[in-house]
Amino acid sequence: MSDFKQSGTIVTFPRLRPRDEAQREKELVTHARRTPLALIIPCLVSELEQPALAGMVARLAGTPYLDTAVISLDRADAAGYARALEYFRALRLRTMVVWNDAEPVAAIIREIEMAVLNLGPRGKGRAVWVALGAVIAEERAEAVAFLDADVVTFERSLLTNLVYPILHPALDFDYAKGYYARYSDRLHGRVTRLMVRPLLQALLNTVGHHPYLEYVDSFRYPLSGEFAVHATLLRRLRIPSDWGLE
């Protein structure tokens, strides 16, 4: 999955050669003046105890091209929310912590469900959906990136490379999804290998040529939680609120 072959209906950018990270960030700072970037990280309060999130916060701290970090916090009581506020000060960025267990948020959810639609069970999808609503309502960000809170090997270059095609005005991309090679003595990506790929192939064999199925099948890591979207596309998408995997 780490080769340079272009297949399917999307463009795949491998890391062909290393570049000066500082220079790339400097370019993004310039582009972000025109296209402000928000970063959404959904997380459980229990993840504040994990080294993965601590490492991510340390590496994201002071990211110069980031306008706003939005933390969608789940399963937290008042003490957990207060701890999260203090914890994410280390980002040294404009930061919004959305407390999904707070009564005002619950009241908004109830109002939506009574007036419009059933949002389904709580989970990662709901956390992302609520955070997206907050970002769109602010009308401040013109691009949004998403990261999982448990990326043990996270480096800031992952975010830089992810958002570069979205923020660079000459590249004209509206959506980017991350993928990466994992080298170890274990087989990773069991859900993708054992369920997603066979399911997509079965659907293609049954339905035949279908643009959407071929589009999804083109991604190296279709379940990757790292992706970025331009706001013009984001506002047009009907994003569900009840998913558990991407």
Positions of the model-derived regions?
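Short beta-strand/loop segment that forms part of the nucleotide-sugar
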Residues: 65-77, 96-102
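Phosphate/oxyanion-binding active-site loops and adjacent basic polyanion-contact surfaces
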Residues: 48-52, 120-128, 155, 191-195
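Short beta-strand-to-loop acidic/aromatic patch adjacent to the donor-nucleotide binding site
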Residues: 138-152
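Active-site-proximal specificity loops/subdomain of glycosyltransferases
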Residues: 80-140
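Conserved catalytic loops of nucleotide-sugar-dependent glycosyltransferases that act on lipid-linked
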Residues: 187-246
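Short acidic, S/G/P-rich loop/turn micro-motifs used as interaction or catalytic elements
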Residues: 44-49, 76-78, 151-154, 182-184
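Conserved donor-nucleotide/metal-binding helix-loop-beta segment in metal-dependent transferases, i.e.
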Residues: 152-181
